[in-house]
């Protein structure tokens, strides 16, 4: 907590000398050793993503997500069609370099340049991406880009019952900050949101 006080003796927050709001994330390609983070392109990525997602025959990957499962490629493509035009969320595809195939999607969302805060979300990792270096590196590349732009805080929120997502957040260096009860309705269910953050030093 702050040890600074104002002229009234009230505790106040730390000053941010020279603070300027960062630019919004742009549609650019982020290149790593195992993967590329590419702006979502329906014509280029839809079929590859659908095929990768379809390896989850039971549909387990969709349990805690707002979309899916999808019964056909046409249904998935129709859901995907408007996403590339969105500015917030700003969608990307995760491409496995070894396979040369899109294997997952994610987005920057709740983009708040004025306060230097951005959230990563809409994460849909196919079985080809789950628990692989591609998953770790894709999240690293997105986080790195946000901090390079000058964002002070990078957030990850998930269903409080999603143990896998909570473990992934902890492994990536996020810190648990609290639970938001009755925060969201997801697929007709009440969703308790598990909030974590990865604040920068300034």
Where is each model-derived feature located?
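GNAT-family acyltransferases
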Residues: 1-132, 145-149, 187-202
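Flexible ATP-lid and adjacent glycine-rich G1/G2 motifs of the Bergerat
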Residues: 142
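Conserved catalytic-core motifs of GNAT/GCN5-like acyltransferases
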Residues: 157, 175-189
């Amino acid at each position: 907590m702050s040890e600074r006080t104002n002229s009234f003796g009230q505790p106040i927050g730390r000053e941010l000398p020279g603070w300027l709001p960062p630019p919004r994330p742009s549609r650019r390609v982020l290149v790593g050793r195992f993967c590329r983070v590419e702006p979502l392109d329906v014509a280029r990525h839809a079929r590859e993503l659908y095929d990768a997602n379809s390896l989850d025959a039971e549909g387990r990957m969709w349990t805690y997500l707002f979309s899916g499962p999808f019964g056909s490629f046409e249904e998935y493509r129709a859901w995907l069609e408007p996403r590339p035009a969105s500015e917030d969320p700003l969608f990307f595809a995760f491409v496995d370099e070894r396979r040369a195939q899109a294997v997952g999607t994610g987005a920057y969302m709740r983009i708040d340049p004025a306060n230097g805060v951005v959230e990563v979300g809409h994460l849909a990792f196919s079985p080809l991406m789950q628990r692989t270096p591609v998953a770790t590196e894709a999240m690293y590349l997105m986080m790195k880009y946000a901090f390079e732009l000058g964002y002070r805080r990078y957030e990850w929120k998930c269903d409080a019952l999603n143990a896998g997502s909570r473990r992934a957040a902890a492994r990536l260096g996020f810190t648990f900050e609290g639970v938001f009860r009755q925060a969201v309705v997801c697929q007709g269910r009440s969703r308790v949101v598990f909030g974590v953050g990865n604040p920068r030093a300034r």
